[in-house]
Amino acid sequence: MAIARTGVYVDDYLEYASTFPAELQRLLNTVRELDERSQSLINQTRQQTKYCLGLASQSSKKGNGNHYNNGGLDEEETIEKMRKEIESSQENALSLCTEKVLLARQAYDLIDSHVKRLDEDLNNFAEDLKQEGKIPPDEPSVLPPLPIVPKAEKRKSFYGTPQPKKIDYRDRDWDRDRDFELMPPPGSNRKDLMPIEEQPIDPNEPTYCVCHQVSFGDMIACDNENCQGGEWFHYTCVGLTPETRFKGKWYCPTCRLLPQSH
């Protein structure tokens, strides 16, 4: 009976996962395409900014050395036109990066759903083995899980989160807010997923923060790339709220004690 049921579980899962490789490949290819396009825009704005600053410097020298500014109006018009082009390119690049993050979240959720389905089938198969006396009744219902997310994974990974609030990029401190809106903490929407009945917490689920718990709710990332204090931190654990969150460089309690954080 157990052997027959094994075949059923395998066939069902293979059918369920039949479109998985193509879907994942499509998402990753799109992410790569968006990354190339956004990087091209970033390089373009970098060159435009450099040229614009050089033009402004030359205009300033001409103004200081002469009582008249020959061609100054043309240079100002050129600088203003280029400034608008730079702003437009930045907005387009930011839009592409946001789309890239959303696709990366979809890819993670896709992988996560297949892993959960596999865990569920393994649990059901283990229960069948118990009923047939193939394994002891007190054997854990979950078979040893395969590692999904390496614990050494760094904080800048993209994972699924609830839908972010609409961002007004012109009024925000991009360097700080990108950690909140575009680079949310790993797996923070898992509280919304229905867990498999009676399944214990996956021991491979990464833990963060000073509380050493899994990610959930609003979290903030430490700006120390080599953070050893938890990498991502729940607002409540570090005394933050969405209204009082820190703008600028933010370091966790552990990294604040390091010299380079000052």
From Swiss-Prot:
One of its GO terms (cellular component) is nucleus. It is found in: Nucleus. One of its GO terms (molecular function) is histone H3K4me3 reader activity. Ubiquitously expressed. Its main location: nucleus. SMART domains: ING, PHD. The record marks 208, 219, 223, 232 as: Histone H3K4me3 binding. Pfam families: ING, PHD. InterPro entries: ING_fam (IPR028651), ING_N_histone-binding (IPR024610), Znf_FYVE_PHD (IPR011011), Znf_PHD (IPR001965), Znf_PHD-finger (IPR019787), Znf_RING/FYVE/PHD (IPR013083). It comes from the Eukaryota. Zn(2+) 2 binds at residues 222, 227, 252, 255. Zn(2+) 1 binds at residues 209, 211, 234, 237. A zinc finger (PHD-type) spans 206-258. Keywords: Chromatin regulator, Growth regulation, Metal-binding, Nucleus, Transcription, Transcription regulation, Zinc, Zinc-finger. The PHD-type zinc finger mediates the binding to H3K4me3. Interacts with H3K4me3 and to a lesser extent with H3K4me2. Belongs to the ING family. Histone-binding component that specifically recognizes H3 tails trimethylated on 'Lys-4' (H3K4me3), which mark transcription start sites of virtually all active genes. PANTHER family: INHIBITOR OF GROWTH PROTEIN, INHIBITOR OF GROWTH PROTEIN 5. This is PHD finger protein ING2.
